[in-house]
């Protein structure tokens, strides 16, 4: 594997682009934008920070923003893999970075942690059309720089919301597409009033039937922002919210059904008394989330700048579930709702200074989370023994988190700089689990009514050092070397399904950036060494959460090449690929009633090869045609690398056309956009799961295996018209 990585590095002739669009160049940026960036700069990597990262500007998002979620919009970036329950990138979707699932990808919005405090999942479905209110995204791979929230074990996304508009504007966006997809969005800005105040907002609606049967989405969102600024001050008050009603499509399909009826969805299926199959019409997921942020950025004396942010998030909702009656009618079906009601609030802060000799940042955060988990019956009848809306579990989770960090980038010479980053993070977490809520270790710690539940109370203290070197050899070549440690607490689901340990990661990065006449290249080698990594088993618990288990030693060793080639004035080619080795050491698993050793196995959900191309053709100033290609190599859905759990590789191509239809005197910014997804109609699945169960056979346990898959849509089209006044 090491020879492959070395040869690939030497033989690569691809080219790299890692720059923000011209609107973000320092020479053209306004003072208001400079102050605005203070909010995210404390967490973001700079050009001479010794970590691999990718910046995505608003202009890059607009081209492909027709209705799909952020994971779909960034799927062509290095080491990223996305998957969608409904098969279209609308509704429930998620990303993996370097093989690490969404619970291990740190996401912040204006520096505020967005990962759910207990599950650490990122529910993009709660942010429909949020990309329309995004100014830029930075994706860091590996541990990266210190950030707020849970540790990054595969990567991090740092999102900056919309910047102020100097002039008044009004915009309308409408999208139509396959599977009855429709998106309507309106946005506005007052421009600066009396040079100090600006108000802006967006209101969006997205509806789609989805590719999978009964996987529809009904999504609504808004974004409101008020800004006050003067020469040294910027204050932003934000309120953004989403309401999602989605059909449940997270069940997947088994291998045989995948061949015969790939759009099948078992959710809500039940039998009539006459034996006919029917589907419960309210098998829905219904959740609302409100987010509030107040950010105050201030230029102080002697070159210092400060940021203080307050935030509050309130989420509440449920999924309604029909528990199927057996075909023999001996067991009566029932209906329940499983609720979440949670509050998350806190403060972030940073103090920074930049000089010719050094850059320094001091920052941190204090956050509090309260979550309620409860289930209600939605029927009444003596055959069940419960009344309407009786609770069959009633649990909670509480989490307090504090972190503080100090970063120093010191220029030893004009060519060599040293980077240091120290973080202390403290977590206090307590929770209860009832058996019906999806967990509990079975120990008698307390009760709710007649139900036994489990209590936990945990405290973690983590110290995470990072350091590195950046060397500018000449105007064409930069090199960097870095080390970073990350430590991470288990999730609620981990506690509900076992007795987990916190995990630790030591991350080593070695990179080269080349800048030449018509191409740019970034080559990055990484070695990520884990202790007690919580890995996906491929199995799910009784409420659909993915089950993870600690393993002893494991690692990820890989090479990332990210490039851009400027062919001529009309053509350019962006290319990136990742080749990696992802291994468990001495993996053991209970199989056929025995603890069996499987040796060194490939980490599940970790393809050895990920590759992307974006070929851009601009025949004139008004038209851009892009072919966006995505290859994901084969991967295992199980940690034991069972042959039946191998997910096939796939190669997908999307065609994106943007036509500038601006009409002087009517709209100076009017665009017609077309996105043809999967133009070659490939039948593929980009995610799935694996499970085992034991039965007695001839007096001895026999293990049986199964898999399930999430099929994705074939060729489908989205057509959008953006008009800005």
Where do the protein language model's features map onto the residues?
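Face-selective signature of the C-terminal outer-membrane beta-barrel domain
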Residues: 234, 286-441, 470-472, 476-482, ...
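Gram-negative outer-membrane beta-barrel transporters
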Residues: 414, 527, 549-640
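C-terminal beta-signal and adjacent terminal beta-strands/loops
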Residues: 487, 573, 583, 633-636, ...
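Extracytoplasmic beta-strand/coil segments of soluble accessory domains associated
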Residues: 71-113, 135
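Short acidic/polar hinge/loop motifs at secondary-structure boundaries
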Residues: 113-141, 160
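N-terminal periplasmic "start-of-domain" segments of outer-membrane beta-barrel proteins
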Residues: 32-65, 94
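Transmembrane beta-barrel wall of Gram-negative outer-membrane proteins
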Residues: 176-207, 212-249, 284-287, 292-302, ...
């Amino acid at each position: 594997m090491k020879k492959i990585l070395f040869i690939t590095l030497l033989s690569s002739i691809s080219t790299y682009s890692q720059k923000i669009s011209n609107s973000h160049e320092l020479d053209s940026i306004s003072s208001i934008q400079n102050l605005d960036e203070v909010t995210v700069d404390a967490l973001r990597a700079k050009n001479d920070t010794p970590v691999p990262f990718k910046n995505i500007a608003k202009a890059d998002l607009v081209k492909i923003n027709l209705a799909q979620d952020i994971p779909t919009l960034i799927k062509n970036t290095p080491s990223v893999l996305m998957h969608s329950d409904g098969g279209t990138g609308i509704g429930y979707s998620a990303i993996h970075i370097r093989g690490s699932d969404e619970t291990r990808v740190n996401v912040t919005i204006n520096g505020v942690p967005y990962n759910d405090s207990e599950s650490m999942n990122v529910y993009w479905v709660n942010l429909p059309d949020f990309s329309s209110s995004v100014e830029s995204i930075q994706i860091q791979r590996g541990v990266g720089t210190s950030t707020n929230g849970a540790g990054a074990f595969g990567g991090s996304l740092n999102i900056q919301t919309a910047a102020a508009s100097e002039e008044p504007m009004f915009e309308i966006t409408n999208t139509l597409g396959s599977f009855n997809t429709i998106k309507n969005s309106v946005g506005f800005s007052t421009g600066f009033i009396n040079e100090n105040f600006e108000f802006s907002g967006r209101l969006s609606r997205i509806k789609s039937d989805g590719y999978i049967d009964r996987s529809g989405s009904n999504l609504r969102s808004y974004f409101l922002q008020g800004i006050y600024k003067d020469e040294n001050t910027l204050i932003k008050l934000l309120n953004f919210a989403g309401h999602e009603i989605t059909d449940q499509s997270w069940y997947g399909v088994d291998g045989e059904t995948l061949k015969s009826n790939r759009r099948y969805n078992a959710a809500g299926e039940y039998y009539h008394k006459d034996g006919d199959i029917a589907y419960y019409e309210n098998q829905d997921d219904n959740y609302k989330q409100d987010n509030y942020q107040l950010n105050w950025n201030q230029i102080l004396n002697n070159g210092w700048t400060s940021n203080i942010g307050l935030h509050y998030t309130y989420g509440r909702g449920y999924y309604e579930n029909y528990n199927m009656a057996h075909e023999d009618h001996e067991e009566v079906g029932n209906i329940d709702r499983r609720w979440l009601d949670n509050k998350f609030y806190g403060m972030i802060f940073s103090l920074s200074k930049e000089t010719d000799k050094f850059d320094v940042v001091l920052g941190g955060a204090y956050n509090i989370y309260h979550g309620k988990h409860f289930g209600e019956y939605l029927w009444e009848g003596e055959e069940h023994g419960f009344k309407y809306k009786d609770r069959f579990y009633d649990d909670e989770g509480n989490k307090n988190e504090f972190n503080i960090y100090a970063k120093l980038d010191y220029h030893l010479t004009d060519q060599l700089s040293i980077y240091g980053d120290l973080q202390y993070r403290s977590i206090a977490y307590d929770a209860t689990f009832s058996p019906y809520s999806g967990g509990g270790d079975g120990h008698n710690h307390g009760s709710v009514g007649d139900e036994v539940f489990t209590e936990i109370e945990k405290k973690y203290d983590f110290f995470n050092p990072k350091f590195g070197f950046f060397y500018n050899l000449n105007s064409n070549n930069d090199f960097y070397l870095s080390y970073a440690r990350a430590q991470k607490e288990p999730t609620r689901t981990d506690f509900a399904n076992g007795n987990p340990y916190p995990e630790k990661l030591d991350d080593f990065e070695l990179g080269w950036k080349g800048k030449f006449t018509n191409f740019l290249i970034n080559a990055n080698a990484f070695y990520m060494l884990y202790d007690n990594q919580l890995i996906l088993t491929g199995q799910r618990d009784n409420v659909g959460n993915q089950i993870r288990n600690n393993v002893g030693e494991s690692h990820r060793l890989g090479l990332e090449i990210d490039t851009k080639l400027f062919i001529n004035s009309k053509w350019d080619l962006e290319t990136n690929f990742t080749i990696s080795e992802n291994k468990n050491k001495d993996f053991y698993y209970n199989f056929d009633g025995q603890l069996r050793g499987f040796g060194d196995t490939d980490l599940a959900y970790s393809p050895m090869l990920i590759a992307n191309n974006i070929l851009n053709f601009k025949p004139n100033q008004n038209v851009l045609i892009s072919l966006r290609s995505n290859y994901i190599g084969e991967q295992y859905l199980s940690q034991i690398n069972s042959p039946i759990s191998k997910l096939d590789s796939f190669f997908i191509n999307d065609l994106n056309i943007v036509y500038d239809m601006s009409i002087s005197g009517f709209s100076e910014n009017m665009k017609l956009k077309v996105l043809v997804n999967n133009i070659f109609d490939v039948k593929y699945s980009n995610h799935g799961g694996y499970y085992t169960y034991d039965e007695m056979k001839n007096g001895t346990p026999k293990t049986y295996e199964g898999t399930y898959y999430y099929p994705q849509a074939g060729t489908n089209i989205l057509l959008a018209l953006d008009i800005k006044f």
